[in-house]
Structure formats: structure tokens, C-alpha cells
Amino acid sequence: MKENKANKKGRKLLWETVIITMILSFMFFYVLYCSNNKYMTREEKAIHGLLYADGSYESFPVYYLSREWEYYPDALLTPEDDLDKYYFRYISIGEYGGMELGNSGRSPYGSGTYRLKIMLPSEQHTYGLYLPEIFSAYNLYVDGVLVGQMGNPDPDHYVERTQNRMFTFKANTSLEILIAVTDKSSASPGIQSVPVFGNPLKINTIRGIAVFINSSVFTLIILVLAFSVWAFFKTRSRANVLFAGVCLCVLGYTCYPLLHTYLALRVQP
């Protein structure tokens, strides 16, 4: 009888733990959805390829460029090209998983060009553009000038490279962003992560927080892994070996954003 009562009490405690964990998880993910959703931030969004970024430079917000880019499929364009001769449509970043624009009969790979125009205050200031990894090679033009390149998007001399990059430049009144992208093999061709535009200091603060969190988690996992290895040599328990293996897997996952912050790497399978 005592064993049955103990078993029932144990099962009840288990179910209570599972339910509480699920509730806390839902609350945590909901907070992330509300606070870290780059598609629902409060600043102005682009409409038909044009963003009005008004206000003084000191109070200039960070703009998540998620909406209505002009996208030119199957075209690796430069500022010298006459864009009126090419077909384009408006897309949101991440709207499609590749460059086929939802057409299952087409290949998701190839080349494409993204264009966005931003209206700015009349005074000249330094602005920043943060580009999370773009698959898998691109040229970045700002007001007709090549300000950055990752890999080589030329299909005949294609070199894939990805990295989280920050570019700064001076501008006033307006500017045009043109990103020419080529991808031949990755799982998510083109621009899938939302670019960020604004005051360089504010953007670097956001980047710094992300790097700090990733570095802290990475360090914590290394410490837990070291403790698991130490515990194995003390106890020779297989559970410690399995836990160390899990730590190694999580370590590999956690180091990915850190590597792509500091190094330009090939696309990993």
C-alpha cells in the first residue's frame, strides 16, 4: 500500500512538473514572439520599395528592413543597369525559402537582386547597415557605390562565403540599397534574415547583446561539459558520457553564430 501511494505521489509530481514546464515554456516563447519579432517592430516599414525614415539623427530608431523590397529574379544587377528593363515584384524578407518565388516548378537556386530606397533627414550623417548571413555570395551597393562583398556572386566565378557583417556609410536626404545575390547549393538561398538599418551605435549595441548572450551560453556549456568529464572519471557512469555527448552537440550548435560573427566561412551542410 505504501509503495502504491509513493508511486501515485511520484506520478502526480511528474505530471505537475511537466505541466508547469509547458506553461513556463509557452510564456517564454510568447515573450520572445512579442519582444524579438523583427516583422512586428513599431518603426515604419517600407511600402512598395520605399521607406520614410524621418526624425532627428539623435532619436533615429533602428529599422528592421523586413517588408516590401523590390526583388528582381534571375538577375545579378549593378547600379549601371537600367532597372526599368527588368521584371520585379515586392517581397518580404523570408517570405520564400528560395529564389523561386513560390513556384515549385523552378529551381530555388540562381541569382536575384534586392533593392530598397530610404528617405532620410536632410543633414548628412553616418548610418549603418547590418546584414546577417546571406546565402551564399553577394555584392552590396549603396547609392551606386560597391561598399561590401561577401564571396563572389558572379555565376562564372562563384565563391560562396557567409558572415554576419556591418557596413557604415554617410548619406543624406535619400539612399538606395542594392544587394545582388547568388546561391547554388544552400538550404535557404538568398536573403532570409532581416537586415537592420540605423544609427551604427544602436545597431552595434544590439549585436553586442546577442554576442554576449551567445558567448555566455557557450562558456556555460563548456563548464558543464568539463564537469561531466570530471564526473565520469570519478564515477565511471555511462550517464555522464551520454550527458557529455549532449553537451558537445549543443556546443556545436551554440558556436555557429559566434563563428559567423568573426569569420567568413563556406556554407556548412
Where are these regions (language model features)?
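An acidic-aromatic loop/edge-strand motif
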Residues: V159-S216
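Intrinsic-disorder/low-complexity, polar/charged segments enriched in Ser/Thr/Lys/Arg/Asp/Glu/Gln
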Residues: Y64, S111-K117, T126-G128, N164-M166, ...
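Extended carbohydrate-recognition surfaces in non-catalytic/accessory domains of CAZymes
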Residues: K8-S122
